Design a protein with these regions (language model features):
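A short helix-loop-beta-strand connector motif used in the catalytic cores of GNAT acetyltransferases and
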Residues: 59-73
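Alpha-helical elements of Rossmann-like donor-binding domains used by nucleotide-donor carbohydrate transfer enzymes
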Residues: 30, 53-57, 117
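Acyl-donor (CoA/ACP) binding surface of acyl/acetyltransferases
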Residues: 1-28, 34, 76-194
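Conserved GNAT-fold acetyl-CoA-binding loop/helix
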Residues: 39-59
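Short, hydrophobic secondary-structure boundary micro-motifs
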Residues: 42-44, 70, 180
């Protein structure tokens, strides 16, 4: 049974340390700070993002039914840990794409949990079969993390990014997720946020 976007957003997963919630307009300043950070945002964009641009993006996002945009938030402190989205949803093909991932430097230890929450939402709640993630080949930490989680390389598009970098499309299937989650479940520790 398919639910509307509004219904799906009422039933978001929680982990040991984090929960997902839909992004809100008031998150715009934090998202801009992350995106405009020279280290965090270096693989995202070539221009600085303005508050007006982010707010406009948020308004357009709200109208889309093929896009779920989240803030992963710490359960105890309610501090934002990351932004992450499940975008370009194709319900006929039962596929979605990881997008807009930015992890706060203080939350890097929780990256596996952030992905686990997104996978739970994608596979268990939306019933998707496949989640893909596009990563620049020069982004070694992201590339290595996707491999470590068990994503498979689906394809490599040469010179496909705005900076001329190759883009690797990684793939995680609904069938592989439970087995892989068991393999990396040690990364889902019950840490105490600082």
């Amino acid at each position: 049974m398919l639910f509307t976007k509004a219904e799906n957003l009422k039933r978001l997963p929680e982990g040991n340390n984090l929960f997902l919630r839909e992004v809100r307009l008031e998150d715009s300043a934090q998202i801009i700070a992350w995106r405009n950070d020279p280290i965090l945002g270096k693989f995202l964009t070539r221009e600085k993002l303005t508050l007006a641009q982010q707010e406009e993006f948020f308004r357009k996002y709200q109208a889309r039914v093929d896009d779920y945009y989240f803030i992963a938030e710490f359960k105890r402190s309610k501090k934002p840990a990351a932004s992450i989205a499940l975008a370009n949803l194709d319900f006929a093909a039962r596929q979605g794409e990881v997008a807009r991932l930015i992890v706060d430097p203080g939350a890097r230890l929780f990256l596996a949990e952030i992905f686990d929450l997104l996978f739970a939402f994608a596979f268990e709640q939306l019933g998707l079969s496949v989640v893909v993630a596009k990563v620049q080949s020069k982004n070694a930490p992201a590339k290595n993390f996707h491999i470590r989680l068990g994503f498979q390389i689906e394809k490599i598009a040469p010179n496909a990014w705005w900076n001329g970098d190759d883009v690797i499309t990684f793939r995680m299937s609904r069938e592989d997720y439970p087995r892989l989650k068991q393999a990396w479940s040690a990364l889902l520790f019950d840490a105490r946020e600082s």
